[in-house]
């Protein structure tokens, strides 16, 4: 997502350069994050790159070391003693969850459909067993069950990333506009643009505190891939991947559960948990659509989403999509 934002920012920079920055963004002192100019967008020091490589290898090394140690043996022995009971509890919970879905208005044959009361020949393979199933599949992407499960997994994954990314785009701008915390660059897409200009970001104004902040775009992309290999590999291996460390996850690949992935124990009540699944996918879909709006706003106005909202509320007749397209 970071790379896509950087590409978008480079396309929109020529347009945004003719717009003056909002006074609320310009007049504030930028004393929290230091920005310095580097020589190239591909600039990289071997010390920092080596540090990121070592840092990305720590999880693999730590897991392997613990699993092969006496501690790992003890953890696995303890897990084996409790696993039978845990599996039985998981089976009972899944049975109650199925009953909750049968009684819920969001699942099954009587669930809401995307055409509402209008008669429509909905795909027979969309049975309403998964959250957020409104019978919408005009392209027939879910005819094959394996493909359907894969796409559902992808949707959940992207929905969660979109919700997290939306917070990451909105919160810095809100803090900056309200004066809670001042950033050198609070607008999400301009951060990527600053990297394309070869700038170095030193977080909190502390010299040297930039992890990959002084690296070029290509090196940052490599770092992101390396740092994501571990979590993605564990997700690919399934929820059993943590059992060598004595961790049992009672759920499935989309909803692992357990203390590690559900520390607040939100899945304790099966009825509430099934409703939370629906709320999650609905809000995740809204977040993914919202990002399309963020991209469009950045390209057309050169501003962040919060500033665009402030402008629209202050003068809705002149600050809207139609007026923007007419100019």
Swiss-Prot record:
Where does it mainly reside? Answer: plastid
Tissue specificity, please? Expressed in a punctuate pattern in cotyledons and leaves. Expressed in flowers, mature siliques and mature embryos.
Q: Where is the transit peptide?
A: 1-64
Q: Cellular location of this protein?
A: Plastid, Chloroplast thylakoid membrane
Name any Gene Ontology BP term.
photosynthesis, light harvesting
Give a Gene Ontology cellular component term annotated to this protein: photosystem I
Q: Which cysteines are joined by disulfide bonds?
A: none
Q: Which InterPro entries does this UniProt record tie to the protein?
A: Chloro_AB-bd_pln (IPR001344), Chloroa_b-bind (IPR022796)
The record's annotation in SUPFAM superfamilies points to:
Chlorophyll a-b binding protein
Q: Summarize the record's induction comment.
A: Induced by blue and far-red light treatments.
What keywords sit in the KW lines? Chlorophyll, Chloroplast, Chromophore, Membrane, Photosynthesis, Photosystem I, Photosystem II, Plastid, Thylakoid, Transit peptide, Transmembrane, Transmembrane helix
Q: Which Pfam families match?
A: Chloroa_b-bind
**Which residue ranges traverse the bilayer?**
161-181, 209-229, 286-306
Q: Name one GO molecular function term.
A: chlorophyll binding
- Family to which this protein belongs: Belongs to the light-harvesting chlorophyll a/b-binding (LHC) protein family.
Q: What does this protein do, in the record's words?
A: The light-harvesting complex (LHC) functions as a light receptor, it captures and delivers excitation energy to photosystems with which it is closely associated. Probably functions in non-photochemical quenching (NPQ) to dissipate energy under conditions where the absorbed light exceeds the electron transfer capacities of the thylakoid complexes contributing to primary photochemistry.
Protein name per its UniProtKB record: Chlorophyll a-b binding protein 7, chloroplastic
Query: What is the scientific name of the source organism?
Result: Arabidopsis thaliana (Mouse-ear cress)
